[in-house]
Amino acid sequence: PEIVVSGGALPWRDAAATEADAAVRFLTDLGVPANRILLESASLDTQQNAQMTEAILRTRGARKVLLVTSALHMRRALAQFEQVLGIEFIPVATDHEVAADPPGLIRWLPDTDALDGSRRALKEYLGYWAGR
């Protein structure tokens, strides 16, 4: 099997490194042979990830693909990849987040983690509806 990693250099992050480069480093650190990793490092959003990955998957005759991304991002990624490629994707969500609310009244106080979660969720909702 081969692994396709997709993601370009995001303007608000370190421009020298792409998301795909970071994924390659992670996978090789885990022991995945570098010659089994296929790189797409030009895309800047999920729609472009799907479009630019299409050529890689088509040349290899892929019919069924595991789509690995964060749990929060999976709905949007799956919709866009299925729309662009029209092949079967099996969703493999990572980094599920589960947290218990603190007891008592403290749970009603403002919290930076909650604000970050709201920001990430809003980004996914907007991205999902914009990508339709």
Language-model features: locations:
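A structural signal for short, hydrophobic/glycine-enriched beta-strand patches
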Residues: 1-109, 114, 118
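A transmembrane-helix-recognition feature enriched in membrane-embedded lipid enzymes
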Residues: 118-132
